[in-house]
Design a protein with these regions (language model features):
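Substrate-binding/access-modulating region of protease and related hydrolase catalytic domains
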Residues: 1-18, 92-95, 99-101
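Short, small-residue alpha-helix embedded
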Residues: 100-114
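Secreted peptidase-domain scaffold signal
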Residues: 146-234
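Alpha-helical segment proximal to the catalytic Tyr-Lys
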Residues: 24
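C-terminal edge strands of extracellular/lumenal beta-sandwich accessory domains
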Residues: 12, 223-237, 265-321
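An often Trp-containing, charged/polar helix-loop segment at the C-terminal end
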Residues: 115-139
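Surface-exposed beta-strand/loop patches in noncatalytic accessory domains
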Residues: 218-260
Length: 321
């Protein structure tokens, strides 16, 4: 599989490198003896990034079948990820991103059913935000994370994590517009139960900000007219705020439509933290109102605390499902 990944012909090409589209990769769901790939590894036929102007692609992945060899002939082995229905209504094994893309499209459609007005930008942000990563988040460097994103995107698409909070994991959703003259300071409540927990890395915050900027194909590599930068700022006992520096630059590039990062916390104050949002434009008429969807998740890493109830008792947030 390493030889396939290193082949320049395996790189994602137009139109799959579109910044505003959802590019879907394929991950093998099972291991087969005569396949060059295996479970949770990029499928032999799935293309890798980077995409346009060096930005990470694919955006997200789904499980699919693999390609194996029966003597000298390539075949698609039968497993629960390779079976598709043919024109005669029979289940047959087949493989390709043509089959993983509908999986992600279906997930997006299901998520949209619980989102107010079936808002596509919020649905898409939730899809990206809750993708299941296929790498060790605690033991990966910048270069390795960039490679992972160019093989797997943000991870495996999942519906349930995108539709619901849980007792120990609370997700906040906000949508709006930004321009050059307007900045957002979005308040997010950090539960007291969580702040009182002793130990290291007791809490995790994950932020995804997805924007829908204007585009102009005549601008070449600058066809994307704007981007929104997101940062997290934790509260101090004095009432001031301290900007939190994420571990990686990956996921926070200028002129990307999606800024996404996470951070674990050990010692911190409860109360209102802030997500700062700022828009940057680069055309002469670049002061457009740019729609965005912001998703923020606060998680108890022990899984034992009911932080959802504490947030609910504030009576400040409206449940959307």
């Amino acid at each position: 599989i390493a030889d396939v990944i290193d082949d320049d012909d395996s790189i994602i090409a137009s139109p799959a490198d579109s910044m505003l589209g959802i590019t879907v990769g394929a991950i093998c769901g099972e291991t087969h003896a005569t396949s060059i790939s295996g479970e949770n590894i990029i499928a032999p036929y799935s293309r890798k990034g980077p995409g346009f102007a060096g930005f990470s692609k694919p955006d997200i992945s789904a499980y699919g079948g693999t390609i194996a060899f029966d003597g000298h002939k390539p075949i698609t082995p039968i497993d629960k990820y390779s079976l598709v229905m043919d024109r005669g209504g029979m289940l047959v094994p087949d493989a390709g991103t043509s089959f993983t893309s509908p999986v992600v499209a279906g997930d997006l459609a299901e998520i949209s059913k619980i989102v107010p007005d079936e808002d596509l930008l919020i649905s898409k942000a939730l899809l990206y935000h809750n993708a299941i990563v296929l790498w060790d988040e605690d033991d990966i460097d910048e270069e390795e994370l960039n490679l992972a994103h160019n093989l797997y995107g943000r991870g495996i698409s999942t519906v349930d994590e995108s539709k619901y909070s849980s007792a120990s994991k609370v997700t906040f959703v906000r949508t709006g517009t930004l321009n050059r003259e307007k900045k957002e300071r979005v308040k997010v409540f950090m539960p007291e139960l969580l702040a009182a927990q002793p130990g290291r890395n007791v809490a995790k915050g994950t932020i995804t900000c997805l924007s829908n900027p204007p585009i102009d194909r005549t601008k070449g590599t600058e066809y994307l007219g704007a981007y929104i930068r997101a940062s997290i700022n934790k509260s101090n006992p004095t009432g001031s705020f301290s900007k939190v520096q994420p571990k990686y630059k990956e996921g926070r590039r200028k002129w990307d439509v999606c800024h996404q990062f996470s951070k674990k916390f050990s010692n911190f104050n409860a109360g209102d933290w802030q997500i700062w949002l700022e828009m940057f434009g680069r055309w002469e008429d670049g002061n457009n109102d740019v729609p965005y969807a912001l998703i923020v998740t606060i998680e108890d890493m022990s899984g034992n605390l009911d932080i959802y109830n504490e947030v609910e008792l504030l009576n400040r947030y409206q449940a959307i499902n």
